[in-house]
A protein has these predicted regions:
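Membrane-proximal intracellular helices of multi-pass ion channels
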Residues: 1-495
Length: 495
């Protein structure tokens, strides 16, 4: 482990987080929230000092290997959440550390689960910071750092791979920093467009920006207790729903459109399946809830919004879908696991993995029926290598193990099975709301501190695609190089 490089990169990340506290500080000044301003300034100064100390001297070896990349990403997200929780604690808006940590992890991981019973009782600047973490975490903390700070291309791709959602990640540009800049430029443009559209249909600038942050990062934090349903506006709902769907698409598609490679953009197999699932689910749920709303338009309106919100893992709500029929709730729970596209800001297992698992299952079945047949799994028009298939299967196995273990631990709180199951599903898949006692109109406040920490771990595991968090806690991660270990073992054997 290259500890100097680890500290150096973390130092830069702390300096970036210190800078990220500037926008909410400005909001605090605008609304005259001086105790909140004090909390932001104290946290920012502490982060800046720590960042300067750690990043004061560049290490001799600046190469980031796979192990360092995984550890840096995991530590960065954990520590950013710890420091990001401090303004909530210092200001008194969320006085207890576990609650503040849960809320901040939920923000950065774009989960949207909350411990707040009355979100509208919070100060404007703290609500802004809460939603701003959604936006920063959507594209990735490390991607943001690489976009704004000079980062060497010396295997920095390991950082992007460790943080990016999906079974694989490719470079848009030959340079890592250029890739990060292009991604964040597209991300920023879409966010600005949505904010302007929401303002044009009547939302105040503050509400429009908060809503856009939640949709862009697919995090779903709102400044209203009733989420998007508080506005009672079909226009606001449709704009938000469309942009949730757009942010759930692989950003490579937008890059292809940008450079006018329309054939490659529309040939994306994952995008076609993703849009097909949204259409089919919307029609199925609309048919099932028709008797609740009495007309086709209202049924489609609520169905499309909630399907888009859940499959993109945003978590916004326009109605209490806890009251919907069992079939509709079952569809939404299934979509929690599907998730959005790889390379998007959405969470979940990802449509690409679902496609690969279905195709490999079909291949295995064909091999049983026709042992001598030669079959190849193809995805996006290309044959998949064994390494990719193995990686997807390993991910799914680890996902299942973590899900089962987390469910067993959360069950200690003695809530009903649906609440327990969907609480874990919503956190591990970065959804936000679940069903029953963790539905869209209630919160996670009643869980014990231990369970909140377990669910926070699940959020981080889900957002970072499992491996970085597991590597962080693996004892072998912190040992020195294999050559050093071999020398130590040989020396021990002499005695």
């Amino acid at each position: 482990m290259n500890y100097r490089m680890l500290g150096y990169v973390l130092g830069r990340i702390f300096m970036v987080e210190a800078a990220l506290l500037l926008p909410p500080s400005i909001v605090a000044v605008i609304y005259g929230e001086w105790s909140c301003l004090f909390a932001f300034v104290v946290t920012a100064v502490g982060l800046a000092v720590l960042g300067l100390v750690l990043g004061l001297r560049s290490p001799a070896n600046t190469v980031i290997y796979a192990r360092e990349g995984l550890v840096i990403v995991a530590l960065a997200w954990v520590l950013m959440s710890v420091f990001g929780a401090l303004p909530f604690i210092i200001s008194g808006d969320i006085p207890f550390f576990v609650d503040a940590f849960f809320e901040t992890v939920s923000g950065f991981t774009t989960t949207g689960s909350s411990i707040l019973r009355d979100v509208e009782a919070m100060s404007y600047s703290m609500l802004f910071w809460r939603s701003f973490t959604n936006w920063v975490g959507g594209m990735g903390v490390l991607v943001f750092t690489m976009a704004v700070l000079p980062v060497s291309d010396g295997r920095a791709m390991h950082l992007m791979r460790a943080e990016s959602p999906g079974p694989s990640v490719g470079k848009i540009s030959s340079k890592i920093r250029d890739t990060a800049k292009i991604l964040y430029a597209m991300y920023l443009v879409l966010t600005v467009v949505q904010t302007i559209l929401l303002r044009l249909v009547g939302l105040p600038w503050y509400d429009a920006l908060i809503t856009a942050f939640g949709a862009a990062g697919t995090g779903g934090f709102s400044n209203r207790a009733a989420s998007i349903g508080a506005y009672g506006s079909p226009a606001v709902e449709m704009i938000t729903a469309v942009f949730m769907v757009l942010f759930g698409i692989n950003f490579n598609v937008y890059f292809f459109l940008l450079i006018r490679h329309f054939k490659e953009a529309f040939a994306c197999e994952e995008m076609r399946v993703y849009l097909g699932v949204i259409a089919a689910s919307t029609l199925a749920v609309a048919g099932n809830i028709f008797h609740l709303y009495g007309n086709v338009w209202q049924s489609l309106r609520y169905s499309f919004f909630q399907v888009a919100s859940i499959i993109t893992t945003t978590g916004y709500a326009t109605t209490d879908f806890n009251m919907w029929p069992t079939f509709s709730k079952a569809v939404l729970v299934l979509l929690m696991f599907f998730g959005a596209c790889a390379g998007s800001t959405g969470g979940g297992i990802k449509i690409s993995r679902i496609i690969i698992m279905c195709k490999t299952a079909k291949q295995d079945l064909m091999r049983v029926l026709h042992p001598h047949a030669v079959t190849t799994v193809r995805f996006e028009g290309k044959p998949l290598d064994d390494k990719t298939v193995f990686g997807v299967r390993t991910y799914m196995n680890l996902y299942l193990i973590i899900f089962v273990l987390s469910t067993m631990v959360v069950a200690i709180n003695q809530f009903d099975l649906v609440t327990t199951f969907t609480a874990v599903a919503s956190c591990l898949n970065n959804i936000g709301p679940g069903l029953e006692l963790v539905g869209p109109m209630v919160s996670f406040a009643d869980f014990s501190p231990l369970i909140k920490l377990v669910l926070s771990f699940d959020m981080l595991v889900g957002r970072l695609e499992i491996f970085p968090m597991l590597v962080l806690f693996a004892p072998s991660t912190w040992l020195r190089s294999k050559g050093h270990l071999d020398r130590r073992l040989r020396a021990r054997n002499l005695f």
